Amino acid sequence: MGVRAQQKERTRRSLVEAAFSQLSAERSFASLSLREVAREAGIAPTSFYRHFRDVDELGLTMVDESGLMLRQLMRQARQRIAKGGSVIRTSVSTFMEFIGNNPNAFRLLLRERSGTSAAFRAAVAREIQHFIAELADYLELENHMPRAFTEAQAEAMVTIVFSAGAEALDVSPEQRGQLEERLVLQLRMISKGAYYWYRREQEKMAQNSDK
C-alpha cells in the first residue's frame, strides 16, 4: 500500500472512530452531523466525501465493524474454551467484556436494529444472522445435533444475550456481574432444554420405527 493510500485509510479510520466516540446513552447515530464527525476527526467537512458517499454509508460501515468485532471476540472465546473452561461462562464473560470495552458499538447495533432506516435494520439483521449462524455451527459440531435444532438454540441464546447486553450498558460493575450470573443461568437452561428436547425427539423416532 502506497503512502497516499495509507493516509487515506488512516483518515477513514479516524472518521469511523470519531463517529463512535460521539455516541452515548443520550445520543444516537441519527443525531450526528457530518460537520461534527469531520471536526472530531480533524478534517474539513468537504474532505469527508473522499471517504464516504454520505453519513449513512459511514453508519453502515460502523454496523459492519461492530458485528465483525463481536464475532471475532466470540471466536477467540471458543479458542479459549478449546483449551479448557466452561463454554457458557467463558462466552458470557467475553461478551460482557465487549460491552464494557465497546459500549457505543453495541449501542449502535441495538438502536439501529429497530431504527427508522430500512438499510440500517437490514445491516444489523445481517450481522445478527452471522452471529447466530456461527454459534449454530459450533453447537452442531460440539453437540452432534441436527442443524434445525442448533439454529433454534442459537437464535434463542442470541436473543437473550442481546437483551442482557442492553441492560448491561449503563449499570455499575456490581450490577453487571449480577446480570452476567443471571445470563449464565438462562443460557444453561436453554442448553439443557435443547439437549433433552432432542433426546425426546430421538426416542419418539426410535419408537415409531419399531412399530
Curated annotation (Swiss-Prot):
The keyword Lipid biosynthesis appears for this protein: yes
DNA-binding region listed in the record: 33-52
GO terms for biological process, alphabetical: fatty acid biosynthetic process; negative regulation of fatty acid biosynthetic process
Residues in HTH tetR-type domain copies: 10-70
InterPro entries in the cross-refs: DesT_TetR_C, Homeodomain-like_sf, HTH_TetR, HTH_transcr_repressor_FabR, Tscrpt_reg_HTH_FabR
Keywords: Cytoplasm, DNA-binding, Fatty acid biosynthesis, Fatty acid metabolism, Lipid biosynthesis, Lipid metabolism, Repressor, Transcription, Transcription regulation
PANTHER family: HTH-TYPE TRANSCRIPTIONAL REPRESSOR FABR
Subunit annotation: Homodimer.
Protein name: HTH-type transcriptional repressor FabR
Taxonomic source organism: Cronobacter sakazakii (strain ATCC BAA-894)
Gene: fabR
